[in-house]
């Protein structure tokens, strides 16, 4: 008689091979609020012009652990005066196991920032409000679309580069 083994018996623990992603921690890594034109700026009659810039970075922090940092810079100006400037780096540690290498960049540069953004937005809004300025609510950002746009630009750039000579 021969013994038959099922597919389930060939793996010691099938769940060990499934992709797993978990948010381990999220935190303010760096926060700066500057109010260089106080107290005169509070008497200015007009609303400040707001400029918002953001950047996303990721790095491996350990085995199966990645840090994703969302940097937000907000500058409010009235004429040639700076009403306030906020620089925030809000980061998260993500545990990632059994995810194919080609799927890491979309997660680290699109999905992870999407998860962090609401919390970073609140920290920035609180800092601005605590500086005695009208609270600023940042509009949601479509990080997935931005990632796709950047990936397409990089592909187009790579294709436009002349091939090296052998």
Curated annotation (Swiss-Prot):
GO BP, one annotated term: protein transport
Keyword Chloroplast attributed: no
Superkingdom classification of source: Bacteria
Cellular component terms (Gene Ontology): cytoplasm
Keyword Transport on entry: yes
UniProt keyword list: Chaperone, Cytoplasm, Protein transport, Translocation, Transport
Stored Gene3D superfamilies: SecB-like
Regions that span the bilayer: none
GO molecular function per UniProt: unfolded protein binding
UniProt cross-references to InterPro entries, sorted A to Z: SecB (IPR003708), SecB-like_sf (IPR035958)
Family matches, as Pfam families: SecB
Subunit-structure text: Homotetramer, a dimer of dimers. One homotetramer interacts with 1 SecA dimer.
Record family assignment: Belongs to the SecB family.
Chain's role: One of the proteins required for the normal export of preproteins out of the cell cytoplasm. It is a molecular chaperone that binds to a subset of precursor proteins, maintaining them in a translocation-competent state. It also specifically binds to its receptor SecA.
Record's protein name: Protein-export protein SecB
């Amino acid at each position: 008689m021969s013994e038959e083994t099922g597919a389930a018996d060939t793996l010691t623990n099938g769940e060990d091979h499934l992709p797993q992603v978990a948010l381990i921690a999220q935190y303010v890594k760096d926060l700066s609020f500057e109010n260089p034109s106080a107290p005169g700026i509070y008497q200015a009659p007009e609303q400040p012009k707001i400029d918002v810039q953001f950047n996303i970075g990721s790095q491996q922090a350990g085995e199966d652990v990645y840090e994703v940092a969302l940097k937000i810079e907000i500058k409010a100006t009235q004429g040639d005066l700076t009403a306030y400037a906020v620089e925030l780096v809000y980061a998260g540690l993500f545990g990632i196991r059994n995810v194919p290498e080609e799927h890491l960049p979309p997660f680290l540069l699109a999905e992870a920032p999407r998860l962090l953004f609401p919390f970073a937005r609140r920290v920035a809004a609180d800092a601005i409000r605590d500086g005695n300025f009208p609270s600023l609510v940042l509009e949601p950002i479509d990080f997935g679309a931005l990632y796709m746009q950047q990936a397409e630009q990089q592909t187009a750039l790579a294709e436009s580069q002349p091939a090296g000579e052998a």
